């Protein structure tokens, strides 16, 4: 997937390139808890709704010394409303350490989430949506709460899929900007949710 400012590619074409690089037998050996990702990608590529969506502005920043694990991507859909997607934690220790840190301090991924949103969407006029799973959902809410007023107003929806609430940064929940975006936050958690129930919640979740 192209990085920031380096063009775009459809989900269908990205899937073709991915499976040229990685065989089914190779992927079957992957024991990571997110190893279902390639099969989900294949399903999206076969979907009339999603196969033509464009992927662009991808960033992936993982650094042990800085204690950061951050990734985000813009997805352009047919309705003309870009979706900014923040990735959650994978099975690397550095990501889990950052998760624990966000319970009592501002973490680098939160800062990067704001900078990414402002870098990608500033200077444009269209409305957009943003969201993510687990830590990604937390980052989406944080970014919308801390971005410029113009961006906050253009955020149509903020989605958190089983994302944690706020600990150290729970003062955000009392900020004027958060209160303005709060009606546009939609949080979803499974019945067996653990992470999505942690820390101070932002809105009542849909189970």
Regions found by a protein language model. Give the residues of each.
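Alpha/beta hydrolase fold serine-hydrolase catalytic domain that processes acyl esters and thioesters
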Residues: 1-82, 86-103, 107-127, 148-207
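Gly/Ala-rich beta-loop-alpha elbow adjacent to hydrolase catalytic centers
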Residues: 131-136, 140
């Amino acid at each position: 997937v192209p990085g920031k400012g380096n063009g775009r590619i459809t989900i269908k074409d990205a899937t073709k390139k991915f499976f040229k690089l990685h065989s089914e037998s190779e992927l079957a050996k992957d024991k990571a808890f997110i190893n279902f990702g390639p099969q989900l990608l294949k399903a999206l590529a076969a979907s009339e709704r999603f196969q033509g969506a464009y992927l662009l502005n991808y960033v992936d920043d993982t650094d042990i010394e800085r204690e950061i694990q951050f990734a985000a991507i813009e997805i352009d859909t047919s309705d003309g409303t870009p979706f900014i997607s923040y990735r959650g934690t994978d099975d690397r220790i550095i990501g889990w350490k950052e998760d624990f840190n966000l319970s009592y301090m501002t973490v680098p991924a939160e800062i990067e989430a704001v900078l990414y949103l402002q870098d990608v969407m500033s200077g444009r006029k269209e409305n957009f949506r943003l969201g993510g799973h687990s830590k990604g959902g937390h980052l989406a809410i944080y970014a919308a709460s801390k971005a410029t007023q113009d961006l906050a107003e253009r955020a149509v929806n903020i989605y958190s899929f089983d994302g944690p609430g706020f600990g150290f940064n729970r003062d955000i929940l009392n900020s004027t900007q958060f209160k303005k975006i709060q009606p546009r936050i939609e949080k979803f958690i499974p019945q067996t949710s653990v992470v999505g129930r942690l820390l101070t919640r932002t809105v009542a979740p849909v189970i």
